[in-house]
């Protein structure tokens, strides 16, 4: 028997507002524990929540960017549960009247485009954070009340690979809207996954399992791959899948049972009595719609159709707004489009990955990178020299030409000097001359390599090729 995998994702995104969802406390990451709190966050008796208007605007902006319908009538509800980092013993969320419904995004997997439906987007407040260490439980309520949106996909995803592509695309769109930075390492984007299997051709869904502790897109993919295999083996052996919540263990790559899954009845939802229902008229919707910036698909189309970039380059450059903005800034400073694309996808990305930093953490600017690329383009700097200059540019900033001169890496373009390197290479490699005469193309490349080695990579490669060909033809 063969099974079809059915996956749905629930993504929590922290909104990048200055204050919390229902209180004026700061909503910034990284403060001292319990310093960003007030009487509302601590659930003092008698205090009343006040809705953050900007959070509502941004939830609407995100919904619109995800092609969703905005509800004219929406409301908040209480989700009741007890936990030490939830001082009210309930969370203010939205149950049956979310702010956004019926959206979609298009993903690309193996060259094919697929549309993934989005059921709903609703607003809620985050809980605090509990840390368990050495027999003690520590509670930090800084995060309590931080504005969240939860984005719930339709069960349209059919593989862990599609789930990864969906998350990449979703993060990209949300980042472009400016409502969140979507940093998983800081908790501003979190994902839970629901997965079930059913025999091919069966319409009814199988029993789903929820996966938690998925701290990166890669772990989402790995957790789903393991669970897909586990459920298939269980079903083939005649077993049954329970409705469970399971935790992904990063060290073993396996999922571990946490608890039997609760249903919505367990939370005893009821309308929040301290907040009036939201009425979103057409004027409000129109004002928010005007704030939606250019989104990744629009930029990608522009890069392909207007700038002539390959589809792959355009896809990589538009994955994050930071990289896309940097690319546009560099070409605005006169850098060649394709050379800039190659450097951002190659040397720049390698540097960022190696040092585990983001563009904003470096001293790179669109202007100084464009300056280096223009030197490469006009032949002043070889690619080999550029690779030696670039780390200094990224770490300390400055001017690429000045760095090149300070390091004694100025490219040799003087013909007399280059001719000496050429003749030395020919005199030392008579067999290569013979090979060239006999039509062996590799001989030319070998000789160029010898010249570049002798000049420590500083010889102008274009002039070397020209002079070498002349000398070979004359011998």
From Swiss-Prot:
Gene Ontology molecular functions: asparaginyl-tRNA synthase (glutamine-hydrolyzing) activity; ATP binding; glutaminyl-tRNA synthase (glutamine-hydrolyzing) activity
Substrates-to-products reaction catalysed: L-glutamyl-tRNA(Gln) + L-glutamine + ATP + H2O = L-glutaminyl-tRNA(Gln) + L-glutamate + ADP + phosphate + H(+); L-aspartyl-tRNA(Asn) + L-glutamine + ATP + H2O = L-asparaginyl-tRNA(Asn) + L-glutamate + ADP + phosphate + 2 H(+)
Pfam families: GatB_N, GatB_Yqey
PROSITE patterns hit by this protein: GATB
Keyword match Ligase: yes
EC id: 6.3.5.-
SMART domains in UniProt: GatB_Yqey (SM00845)
GO biological process, one term: glutaminyl-tRNAGln biosynthesis via transamidation
HAMAP family (alphabetical): GatB
Described purpose of this protein according to its UniProt entry: Allows the formation of correctly charged Asn-tRNA(Asn) or Gln-tRNA(Gln) through the transamidation of misacylated Asp-tRNA(Asn) or Glu-tRNA(Gln) in organisms which lack either or both of asparaginyl-tRNA or glutaminyl-tRNA synthetases. The reaction takes place in the presence of glutamine and ATP through an activated phospho-Asp-tRNA(Asn) or phospho-Glu-tRNA(Gln).
Family: Belongs to the GatB/GatE family. GatB subfamily.
Name by which UniProt lists this protein: Aspartyl/glutamyl-tRNA(Asn/Gln) amidotransferase subunit B
Organism: Staphylococcus epidermidis (strain ATCC 35984 / DSM 28319 / BCRC 17069 / CCUG 31568 / BM 3577 / RP62A)
Chain's gene name: gatB
């Amino acid at each position: 028997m063969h099974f079809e995998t059915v996956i749905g994702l629930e993504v929590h995104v922290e909104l990048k507002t200055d204050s919390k969802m229902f209180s004026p406390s700061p909503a910034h990451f990284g403060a001292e524990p319990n310093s960003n709190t007030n009487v509302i966050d601590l659930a003092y008796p008698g205090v009343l929540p006040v809705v953050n208007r900007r959070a509502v605007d941004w939830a609407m902006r995100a919904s619109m960017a995800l092609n969703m319908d905005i509800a004219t009538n929406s409301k908040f509800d209480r989700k009741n549960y007890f936990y030490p980092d939830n001082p009210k013993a309930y969370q203010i969320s939205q149950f049956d009247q979310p702010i956004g419904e019926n959206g979609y995004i298009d993903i690309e997997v193996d060259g094919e485009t697929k549309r993934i439906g989005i059921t709903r987007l609703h607003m809620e407040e985050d809980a605090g954070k509990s840390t368990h260490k050495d027999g003690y439980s520590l509670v930090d309520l800084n995060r309590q009340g931080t504005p969240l949106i939860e984005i719930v996909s339709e069960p349209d995803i059919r593989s862990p690979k599609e789930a990864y592509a969906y998350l990449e695309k979703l993060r990209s769109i949300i980042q472009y809207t400016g409502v969140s930075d979507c940093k998983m390492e800081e908790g501003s984007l979190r994902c839970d996954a629901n997965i079930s299997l059913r025999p091919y051709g069966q319409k009814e869904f199988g029993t789903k399992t929820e996966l938690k502790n998925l701290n990166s897109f890669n772990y989402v993919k790995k957790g789903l791959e393991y669970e897909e295999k586990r459920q298939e083996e269980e079903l083939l052996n005649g077993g049954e899948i329970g409705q469970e919540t399971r935790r992904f263990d990063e060290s073993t790559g396996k999922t571990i049972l946490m608890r039997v899954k609760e249903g919505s009845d367990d939370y005893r939802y009821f309308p929040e009595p301290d907040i009036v229902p939201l009425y979103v008229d057409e004027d409000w919707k129109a004002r928010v719609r005007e704030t939606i910036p250019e989104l990744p698909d629009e930029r990608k189309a522009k890069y392909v159709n207007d700038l002539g970039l390959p589809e792959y380059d355009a896809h990589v450059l538009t994955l994050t707004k930071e990289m896309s903005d940097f690319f546009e800034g560099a070409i605005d400073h006169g850098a060649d489009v394709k050379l800039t694309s190659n450097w951002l996808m190659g040397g720049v990305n390698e540097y960022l990955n190696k040092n585990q930093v983001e563009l904003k953490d470096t001293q790179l600017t669109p202007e100084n990178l464009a300056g280096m690329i223009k030197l490469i383009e006009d032949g002043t700097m070889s690619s080999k020299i550029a690779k030696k200059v670039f780390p200094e540019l990224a770490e300390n900033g400055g001017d690429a030409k000045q760095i090149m001169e300070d390091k004694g890496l100025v490219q040799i373009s003087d013909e007399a000097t280059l001719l000496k390197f050429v003749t030395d290479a020919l005199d030392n490699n008579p067999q290569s001359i013979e090979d060239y005469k006999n039509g062996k193309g590799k001989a030319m490349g070998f000789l160029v390599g010898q010249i570049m080695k002798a000049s420590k990579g500083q010889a102008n490669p274009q002039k070397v090729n020209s002079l070498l060909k002349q000398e070979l033809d004359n011998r």
